[in-house]
A protein has these predicted regions:
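A polyanion-binding, active-site-adjacent surface
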Residues: 3-229
Length: 229
């Protein structure tokens, strides 16, 4: 496909029908059938979860993969889970979201200057995609980066996302040596882009204080500075 004719809509259409990874297809569909008790009466999405947000975004927020009972249930990344609760509250405080919660596709949430995606678009068992599954999914991120013409900053939520961002940028011809190491508020200049590290807003990090609200807000304030917005 020619990148010049590509669009976020076309990428989304390709993502939601993807069945390239048999293990992930089996897992996401089994979770959607069996369901956890608290969501037993809800219809699960059970498909790959596309990126979403402002098509004129200067900032991409990049996660690992949808949560099995979060994005895999609701059809939107970081929607309907504790990580999303923490993330969107911060995006609202820092002026990137019109509301502090993200619970469903039709909840009225809108993003400003931000686009959210994940390295892997399907929920993986134990939140651990294999290297092969990562590599099969990475072209979707490469296409999104190419289409987002105003993009300047990629906020990588965790080391897996940091690695995925660097791999995607390398596929577009932007290679940095030696390879930058992940850290909270670490910055890597990669061609015309900056990759900005942030601890993932997982319960493991937020409940233990490894990532606080102030720390996450500081990341998005810095992303705005780097993007020149």
């Amino acid at each position: 496909m020619s990148v010049g004719r590509d669009s976020l809509e076309r990428i989304r259409d390709d993502v939601v029908v993807c069945r390239l990874c048999p293990r992930l297809v089996e897992w996401r569909e089994r979770v959607a059938r069996e369901k956890v008790a608290r969501f037993a009466n809800q219809e699960y999405w059970g498909r790959p979860v596309p990126g979403w947000g402002d098509p004129d975004a200067a900032i991409v927020i990049l996660g690992l993969a949808p949560a099995a009972d979060g994005g895999n249930r609701t059809g939107r990344i970081f929607t309907g889970d504790r990580s999303g609760d923490f993330l969107f509250a911060s995006l609202h405080r820092t002026g990137f979201a019109n509301q502090p919660t993200s619970v469903s596709l039709d909840d009225g949430l809108r993003l400003r200057d931000v686009y959210i995606a994940a390295v892997n678009r399907c929920a993986p068992p134990a939140n651990k995609p294999t290297p092969e599954e990562r590599d099969r999914c990475l072209p979707y991120l490469v296409r999104e980066i190419a289409v987002l013409r105003d993009l300047r900053v990629i906020v990588a939520l965790g080391a897996f996302a940091w690695d995925g961002a660097l791999r995607a940028l390398a596929a577009l011809g932007h290679v940095v040596k030696p390879r930058p190491r992940f850290g909270h508020l670490a910055e890597a200049s990669v061609g015309p882009f900056t990759v900005l590290g942030c601890f993932h807003p997982s319960q493991q990090n937020t409940f233990t204080g490894k990532l606080t609200t102030q720390m996450l807000d500081a990341v998005f304030d810095r992303a705005r500075e780097l993007a020149g917005r």
